[in-house]
From Swiss-Prot:
Family: Belongs to the ATP phosphoribosyltransferase family. Short subfamily.
Alphabetical UniProt keywords: Amino-acid biosynthesis, ATP-binding, Cytoplasm, Glycosyltransferase, Histidine biosynthesis, Nucleotide-binding, Transferase
Function: Catalyzes the condensation of ATP and 5-phosphoribose 1-diphosphate to form N'-(5'-phosphoribosyl)-ATP (PR-ATP). Has a crucial role in the pathway because the rate of histidine biosynthesis seems to be controlled primarily by regulation of HisG enzymatic activity.
Lineage, opening ranks: Bacteria, Pseudomonadati, Campylobacterota, Epsilonproteobacteria, Campylobacterales
Organism: Campylobacter fetus subsp. fetus (strain 82-40)
GO cellular component, one term: cytoplasm
NCBIfam families recorded: hisG
Protein name, entry field: ATP phosphoribosyltransferase
Database matches in SUPFAM superfamilies: Periplasmic binding protein-like II
InterPro entries: ATP_PRibTrfase_cat (IPR013820), ATP_PRibTrfase_CS (IPR018198), ATP_PRibTrfase_HisG (IPR001348), ATP_PRibTrfase_HisG_short (IPR024893)
E.C. no: 2.4.2.17
Residue stretches in coiled coil: none
Amino acid sequence: MLTVALPKGRIADETLNIFSKIFNDEFKFEDRKLTMIKDNFEFLMVRNQDIPTYVTEGAADIGVVGLDVLEEHNCDVLRLLNLKLGKCKVCIGIKNSDTLDYTKPELKIATKMPNITKNYFASKAVAAKIIKLYGSIELAPIVGLSDAIVDIVETGTTMKQNGLKVADIIMESSAHLIANKNSFITKRDEILSLYHKINSVIN
């Protein structure tokens, strides 16, 4: 049996839809249940940010998670396949009236993704003070907490509604299929079989 960690929300639904196509059967969580066993799979409904931990620690053999989360957590997992679901971008946002001035002695950047942010500005040799927030990132430049933000952008509507614009794109992200390294050895045939079936559906 393969244990599969899925993120709550739209990505889980779209991933289960892929399984439904592969096995010609309905894969669906019952209301409020966090686990589902079906056709030699156990599915776990997990917070997106926790999936790399579940897979790294072996609580799940494989998982589906955004590339941005993988890069932020820098987890020791195998990246098997880009599922091309949940496409988005990690962007730098600033006020409409501002420009991003890389020559400032230190830029203050508010974000939920401190590691991606730190690595990006270090690669540009720009001094940045990272301000870790857990929500309402768009407020930070408006109230003077930061010069800019780093956040996930899907359509850009939230930024526009809050008087912000995209100043730069750090990376593009989409959901990836990942595997625990030990599981890939002990359950190699099962994982590769599933990999090929998923690949044939999405490509």
